Amino acid sequence: MDESKKNERLQQLTDIQYNVTQKAGTERPFQNEFYDNEAKGIYVDIVSGKPLFSSNDQYDAGCGWPSFTKPIDEAEVIEHRDLTHGMIRTEVKSADADSHLGHVFPDGPQDKGGLRYCINSAALRFIPVDKLEEEGYQAYKKIFE
């Protein structure tokens, strides 16, 4: 992502969006926008706009954050070992904007690969299926057909 465009986008973020994506912050569980979203659509990186997750892969993990079994395209997320807070975890960042998204854990549904991508709502923008074309994401409509 072009640095000037990234800086422009960063200036448009709310405090919580900036804290989560740029300072690896975490939202409060059950008090965020998408933890219980049941609408069909895709979730894009709040900074770069790159598609990251689909509602088709979202499930209720009971953790209080949006949870997904997989990204739309694995190339759009980067995983790093995270040793903060006295834990060993795997951090998930967006490949294009290097935004902190959340963490991935090996306790997801076994029949869908066994992973749980636990992602902060503040790192995401939701595009409903009926707005995909209008927002420039028409290529992703096929996911829902």
From Swiss-Prot:
MsrB domain boundaries: 6-129
Gene Ontology CC terms: cytoplasm
Record has Oxidoreductase as a keyword: yes
SUPFAM superfamilies found in the cross-reference section: Mss4-like
Catalysed reaction, written as an equation: L-methionyl-[protein] + [thioredoxin]-disulfide + H2O = L-methionyl-(R)-S-oxide-[protein] + [thioredoxin]-dithiol
Coiled-coil features, chain-numbered ranges: none
Pfam family, any one: SelR
InterPro entries found in the cross-reference section: Met_Sox_Rdtase_MsrB, Met_Sox_Rdtase_MsrB_dom, Mss4-like_sf
Protein name in the entry: Peptide methionine sulfoxide reductase MsrB
